[in-house]
Amino acid sequence: MASDNIKSVEVINNPGARYDASVKAVIRITTKKAKGEGFGFNNRLVGFKHRFGESLYDQFNFNYREGGFDLTGMLSGGHYDNSQGAITTVDVHSANHWRVKNDMSKQKNINHILSGTLSMNYQFNPDHVMGVRYKLSRDPKIRIDGTALAEAFMDGTMYEQSDARYDIGGQFTSHDINAYYNGKVNDWSIDLNLDGMWHKTKQNQFTAQTITETSRKTMEENMTTFNRTRNNLLASKLVISRPLWDGSLSFGGEYSHNSRTNLYHNDEGVLDSDDSEIKEGMTSGFVEYGRSFGKLGVQAGVRYEHVGFDYYDRGKHIDEQSKTYDDVFPSLALSLPIGKVQTQLVYGTDISRPSYSDLRSNITYVNRYLYETGDPYLLPTRSRNLTFASSYQWLNLVLGYQHIMNDISQLCDPFPGKDPSVSLYKYANIDDYDKAFASLTLAPKVGIWQPQLTLSVQKQWYTAETPDGKAEFNRPLGSFQWQNTLQFSKTFNIGVNASFQTKGHSGNTHLDKTSGALSFSAYKSFFKGRFIAQLFAYDLLQTNRQYLTMYNGGRTVKWEIKPNRSVRLTLRYVFNQAKSKYKGTGAGQSQKARM
């Protein structure tokens, strides 16, 4: 979506019961009124250069409108280099102190992508509109290759080292379709969405490594794996609303059924093969009512979700890994102006279900010392939230408190076997904890200068397992973002933005050092907006280097993520371009995100 088609953007911190319980906020974008009939198009060319590689992307959008008929489409393709370096250090505190340093900073991640979308929309009259949209995405080439140097120390003395060369290749294909009807009959408004999705991913990995012991004795070790996943989803969503008792009543439901198959094989037989399938059906219903009592605005709702999760191993139903969930999510929002100050108090509950990748049982090989897996026994994360928001002219304040249950975090466990230097990364539910947060945003306008400063802080009350026993991870985590735009004219502006992150705790992780970034942007349009050039440079001083430590009992993992300075240039040409009238919002969105 191009910025010049946008009229306003609103962030809704209380989406209400009509949205899936995993939705914590909604961004509502209001577009400008559609232009006249005929054919139009725009083409966007994006070049991207960063420290580790280059990317090039082109997107062509077209539209045709005649009467109530609206046809829009998009074709895109590109070469993406998403390479980024990281160094990890695993400390194992057992009978001996083991330290394993993994340097994976020399890695290339290349994607070739193709995508196409076609939407058809017909407005019969102001009260009835329907449409259908199809999207094809294809990544014919996914390539990750590089070297991983690992060094193992026992009680401070070099034990052995491993030099691995890995090559991962794959493809991705997806088909997505949406059909919708949006209508009004007397006082009744109807919004119906029907969705289907079919995804397939294939991946081959080959790793060849040389292991050198302190005696200088060497040995070769190879690992070959194949992984294929398929995701299928059918979903529907119906929302009905009407005025009632000087307010607005909404109710409806959503249904989705999806299946995911995972096939994993290791040629050498070192790792167990996996042939599993997940089938999940979700049924939900909601009712929501809002009205004003004088100056007091009230919105109350409740949502019910039923999820049936079935896990199969080689076609056999596994009872202990199959689950049924029944959850009720109430929500209440009160809004009241006090003089010129707008205030809002919101209570709500939400849920975050684990991704299907996190639920996998197969073990993935990284190198001699590192393996990775999921956990089919993972429970959803739930939270109860209380939020207060206040705004006055260009000042906005948000205060909140959360009680978080069964949060999901990545832990570092010993790999099954006798070698304590080998670790297994896995996802697990951690203990319940509370968290408070606050943010203050100042956005005045001083002539051509439009600054926006956001100050945020969060503090948790969490007890973590460390090598020295239990420890309170309660150190606050602060950040600020300072955006500055100089609007010289309607056709030209520049921006200078800065961000900063403090040390602090988040879950079972400690951010060990401060980090920040300085960025620059420029926008210029020519020929009455037909040609647009945008330049964006991120992390100019290369200061966004991140250091963090993850704790899990007797094991700690230190991460060092290198800075990644980047420059992006976007060139866009527009001819009689009009925004699409397509009003389909989709169904089963939370399930799609988990895939």
Where are these regions (language model features)?
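N-terminal periplasmic accessory domains that precede
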Residues: 1, 11, 21-45, 56-58
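Surface-exposed extracellular loop regions of Gram-negative outer-membrane beta-barrel proteins
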Residues: 31-44, 85, 89, 102, ...
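Transmembrane beta-strands of outer-membrane beta-barrel pores
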Residues: 45-49, 66, 77-81, 136-140, ...
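Transmembrane beta-barrel wall of Gram-negative outer-membrane proteins
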Residues: 53-85, 97-145, 173-175, 183, ...
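Face-selective signature of the C-terminal outer-membrane beta-barrel domain
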Residues: 115-139, 165-314, 337, 341-342, ...
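Outer membrane beta-barrel strand-and-loop segments of large Gram-negative receptors
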Residues: 233-237, 282-284, 379, 385, ...
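Outer-membrane beta-barrel signature, preferentially recognizing the C-terminal barrel domain
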Residues: 277-280, 320-323, 351-405, 423-436, ...
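C-terminal beta-signal and adjacent terminal beta-strands/loops
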Residues: 526-595
